[in-house]
Amino acid sequence: MLKVKILRLASGYGLPLPSYATPKSAGLDLYAAVDSKLVVHPGGRCAVKTGVALELPDGYEAQIRSRSGLAANFGICVLNAPGTIDSDYRGEITVVLSNFGSEDYVISRGDRVAQMVIAPVERVEWEEVNSITATSRGEGGFGSTGT
């Protein structure tokens, strides 16, 4: 199991550290470290602090993703999903949420607002060429394999 250093910031005292909901969950729930209720109006967005900072090992990233229940039931989504936390970032993990629903959504301290997946990252070295191998799909893009 990968060990990751985590720093609980002052705003995160009293909140759980990011945690897996089930033994086989891929994502860790992130908790809102807000001092007072935060209202996200329909069409609006907000930045939600989580009260934690990470020291990811080289070769890893943290991906910030929407929680499926918030997205399906309330239209609350991570705006830049997946958001990437690089291994050299040391600031507080902050989640940008958007309300694509039709009603105000209230975020309270300790609410689970997003999921975080720790994933390996492969760096690349470009090999510039004059052509690339043809495939049966070719340049077919959006919708070319069906909808």
UniProtKB/Swiss-Prot annotation:
**Keyword hit for Lipid metabolism:** no
As for what it does, the entry says: This enzyme is involved in nucleotide metabolism: it produces dUMP, the immediate precursor of thymidine nucleotides and it decreases the intracellular concentration of dUTP so that uracil cannot be incorporated into DNA.
Q: Which reaction does it catalyse?
A: dUTP + H2O = dUMP + diphosphate + H(+)
Q: Which GO terms describe its molecular function?
A: dUTP diphosphatase activity; magnesium ion binding
Lineage at the top is: Bacteria, Pseudomonadati, Pseudomonadota, Alphaproteobacteria, Rickettsiales
Q: What are the binding positions for substrate in this chain?
A: R67, S68, G69, N80, T84, I85, D86
Which pathway, per its entry? Answer: Pyrimidine metabolism; dUMP biosynthesis; dUMP from dCTP (dUTP route): step 2/2
Q: What is this protein called?
A: Deoxyuridine 5'-triphosphate nucleotidohydrolase
Task: Name the Gene Ontology biological process terms.
Answer: dUMP biosynthetic process; dUTP catabolic process
Tell me which InterPro entries the record gives.
dUTPase (IPR008181), dUTPase-like (IPR029054), dUTPase-like_sf (IPR036157), dUTPase_trimeric (IPR033704)
- Which family would the database say this protein is a member of? Belongs to the dUTPase family.
Q: Which cofactor does it need?
A: Mg(2+)
